[in-house]
Amino acid sequence: MGYDEEIDARIRTIINKWENTASKKMFGGVCHLLNGNMFCGVYKNFLILRLGVQGSEEALGRPYVKSMDITGKPIKGWVMVQKQGIVNDEELAAWLERAKKYARTLPPK
């Protein structure tokens, strides 16, 4: 199964306005990088987000959010948001801003 290209197109519309972003196909999906660090992407029909441990724990209490688990073992600091959780661009942009905020705390690669 491929990744949801519609979610990816919506992400690109938002992050293409940001500086220092890049995209890579990985893990059967697509990942987006900020200053060389992965911060979001699309896996199957999920938005994946790197929020850090504290940010991901806070996000897990929200509807349509679960731990990122694509290998059978949850990945700390990452979450997956179901498509129902990003039905409009404002919701998507808010999630991307959270991931961007965390990515900016990481050293550039």
Question: Which residue ranges define each predicted feature?
Answer:
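Charge-dense, helix-prone N-terminal extensions
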Residues: 1-109
